[in-house]
């Protein structure tokens, strides 16, 4: 899988990584993960909150309540648990950086995208609140909209779209690296990855 490929790439340059599989619906595991990070490294230099589920594309009035609950749970509630668990480790770092990954759906009011759009709008609001709360620390929190990207989720949402017309995740990654760098002093802002990279 992709994580194993990343691990191989890291090893190829002489570094090492610890791969941890985690179900974002398992909220209780996040404090344990934070404790393990603290025990091994004592800090967290960067966090990218990218986990998401699309849910079902259907009118709000037809939506299965379980789909609503799951989408909000993974896309918003789990991210709050992540913030709660990881904030002390990020603040312990000399230049902790956090990125919350949003979507154009947070602003587009796309019909049939109800729980996904609502969860991403909520994520952006939470990111701004978190940035305000950490203003006086070394932590920098920002939000990024990658834009349409050739991912599995995009293929599910737009099955007729040619993925070759979209940037790959690798093409978008430099925008994330900018916001994760020690030099980044932006805080509490929403960035459009394509604009950052001139795509």
Identify the residue ranges that each predicted region occupies.
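The beta1-alpha1 cofactor-binding region of Rossmann-like NAD(H)/NADP(H)-dependent oxidoreductases
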Residues: 20-32, 65
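C-terminal helical subdomain
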Residues: 136-139, 143-144, 151, 160-199
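Conserved NAD(P)H cofactor-binding loop of Rossmann-fold oxidoreductase domains
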Residues: 50-56
